[in-house]
C-alpha cells in the first residue's frame, strides 16, 4: 500500500455518471471494471476504490465477462468515455505512468486512433498536474480534472510532519480532534492500543475518511475509527481526511499521535512513543501538559527523554486550565512556572502557550456539524462565557495574530480564537 495515496481525494460526488440513468451507471461500472482488471495491477488501493464506486452507484459485485471489444464500445460512448479513462488512470495507475500509457493504448484500441490527441492531452495533465491543465479543452472533464490536478500537487509535495506527545490524561486525543476538526481519535476513557496514529490532510474535502488499519477503509465510520483492527500486527494506524478550520488548511501535513507514555498497564505504550521520538524525522514536536497536574515525576522523566533525544523545534502547550478560577489561579503564573520547570531540565527559551483543546473541539463541532448532546451544549455555553474574559483569553499569550473580523458576530468563531487553537494552527501551517 502506497501510504502517500491517503492524501488523495475522491471525486465520485462530482462524477457525471453519478447522476446518469441506472442502465448507464451499470454499463459504465462494468466497463471500468474491465479496464482496471486489464492492467493486472490490482492492489489494495484499486480494489477499495472500485468497491467505493460499486457502493456509491449501487452496483453488483459480480463480474460479467466481455465477448468483444465492440461490445465494450457499444456500452460506453459519447461524453463519458474520457471520464472512463481518467477513472482507470486514477484507480490503477496514479503512481505508475507506464501502466497509464498501457491503459491509453488499450483505450485507443477500443475507441479508435481518432481520439489520440484528446487522450494524450488527458495523460499529460493527469501526470503533470496544473502544469498542463490549461492545455486541456475537454469540457466533459471540467469538474473532475481540477480535483485530479490538486491530487497530483498534494501527492508530489513533501509532508510537514508534526509529532504530538504527552502523558496520559493531558488531552492529546482531544487536541488532535480539535486540530483535524473531526472526531477521528479515541479520547482517554476509551481503551487504546499501543499504536502510533498518522493523520494526513487530504487534498480536498470529499466527506470521506480513510483508515488503513490492516485493512483499508475509504469511507470509515466513527465506529470503525474507534475500533482497532486486531489483525493489525504492526504498531501503526494511518488515517486520511481533509482537516477543517475556519481558514482553509491547504498544507500537506501529517500529525503523528504517539501513545501516552505513562500508561501503567502496558509498558509498550512508552516504548513505542519513545522510539517514534528517537527515530522519526519531524518538522515539529508538540508536547502537551495537563494544567491540572503539572510538573509531575512522569512529566519530568518524559521531558528529559525528549530533551535528550529530539533536537528539532518544540511547542509546549498547557491544556485543561478551564477549571481555573479568577483570584485563586493564574494563567500567566502557570505559564511562567512551566517555563521555569523546562529551563531547569535544560530547554533553552522554551515556547509555552495555553490551549483549551476541549473548547476548540466543541467550537469546530458547533460550526461544522452542530451539537445535539445536552452536556456538550452546556459545556459550550460555559466556554463561551469563561474564555471571553481577558484573563482566560488564551490567544493573548501567542506571538502571532489571527484576524477573524469577518466572523466577529459568531460566538463559535470567537471561542476558537479564545481557545488558542487558531493561533496554534497558524504556527503549525504558517
Q: Language-model features: where?
A:
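N-terminal low-complexity/disordered regulatory or targeting extensions
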Residues: 1-168, 182-243, 309, 342-343, ...
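C-terminal end of P-loop GTPase domains and the immediately downstream helical coupling element
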Residues: 2-32, 347-430
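Conserved glycine(s) of the Walker
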Residues: 171-172
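Conserved beta-strand/loop subsegment of P-loop NTPase cores
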Residues: 254, 283-289, 309-325, 333-361
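Inter-motif core of Ras-like GTPase G domains
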Residues: 266-293, 306-312
Amino acid at each position: 500500500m502506497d501510504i502517500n495515496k491517503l492524501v488523495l481525494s475522491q471525486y465520485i460526488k462530482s462524477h457525471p455518471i453519478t447522476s446518469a440513468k441506472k442502465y448507464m451507471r451499470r454499463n459504465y461500472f462494468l466497463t471500468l471494471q474491465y479496464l482496471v482488471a486489464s492492467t493486472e495491477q490490482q492492489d489494495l488501493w484499486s480494489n477499495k476504490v472500485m468497491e467505493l464506486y460499486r457502493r456509491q452507484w449501487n452496483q453488483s459485485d459480480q463480474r460479467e465477462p466481455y465477448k468483444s471489444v465492440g461490445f465494450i464500445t457499444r456500452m460506453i460512448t459519447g461524453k463519458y468515455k474520457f471520464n472512463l479513462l481518467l477513472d482507470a488512470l486514477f484507480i490503477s495507475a496514479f503512481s505508475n505512468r507506464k501502466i497509464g500509457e498501457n491503459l491509453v493504448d488499450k483505450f485507443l484500441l477500443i475507441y479508435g486512433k481518432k481520439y489520440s490527441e484528446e487522450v494524450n492531452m488527458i495523460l499529460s495533465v493527469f501526470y503533470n498536474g496544473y502544469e498542463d491543465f490549461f492545455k486541456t479543452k475537454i469540457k466533459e472533464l471540467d469538474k473532475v480534472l481540477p480535483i485530479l490536478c490538486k491530487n497530483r500537487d498534494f501527492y508530489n509535495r513533501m509532508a510537514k510532519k508534526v509529532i504530538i506527545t504527552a502523558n496520559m490524561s493531558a488531552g492529546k486525543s482531544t487536541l488532535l480532534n480539535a486540530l483535524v476538526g473531526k472526531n477521528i481519535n479515541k479520547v482517554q476513557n476509551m481503551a487504546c492500543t499501543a499504536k502510533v496514529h498518522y493523520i494526513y490532510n487530504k487534498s480536498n474535502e470529499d466527506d470521506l475518511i480513510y483508515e488503513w488499519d490492516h485493512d483499508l477503509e475509504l469511507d470509515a465510520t466513527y465506529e470503525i475509527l474507534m475500533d482497532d483492527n486486531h489483525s493489525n500486527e504492526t504498531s501503526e494506524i494511518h488515517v486520511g481526511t481533509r482537516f477543517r478550520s475556519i481558514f482553509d488548511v491547504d498544507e500537506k501535513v501529517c500529525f503523528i499521535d504517539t501513545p501516552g507514555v505513562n500508561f501503567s498497564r502496558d509498558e509498550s505504550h512508552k516504548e513505542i512513543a519513545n522510539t517514534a521520538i528517537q527515530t522519526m524525522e519531524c518538522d515539529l514536536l508538540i508536547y502537551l501538559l495537563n494544567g491540572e497536574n503539572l510538573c509531575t515525576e512522569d512529566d519530568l522523566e518524559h521531558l528529559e527523554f525528549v530533551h535528550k533525544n529530539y533536537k528539532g523545534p518544540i511547542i509546549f502547550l498547557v491544556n485543561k486550565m478551564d477549571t481555573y478560577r479568577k483570584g485563586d489561579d493564574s494563567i500567566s503564573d502557570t505559564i511562567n512556572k512551566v517555563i521555569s520547570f523546562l529551563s531547569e531540565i535544560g530547554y533553552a527559551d522554551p515556547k509555552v502557550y495555553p490551549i483549551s483543546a476541549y473548547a476548540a473541539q466543541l467550537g469546530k463541532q458547533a460550526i461544522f456539524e452542530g451539537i445535539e448532546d445536552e452536556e456538550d451544549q452546556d459545556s459550550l455555553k460555559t466556554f463561551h462565557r469563561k474564555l471571553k474574559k481577558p484573563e482566560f483569553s488564551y490567544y493573548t499569550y501567542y506571538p502571532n495574530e489571527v484576524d477573524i473580523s469577518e466572523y466577529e458576530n459568531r460566538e463559535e468563531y470567537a471561542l476558537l480564537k479564545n481557545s488558542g487553537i487558531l493561533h496554534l494552527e497558524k504556527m503549525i501551517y504558517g
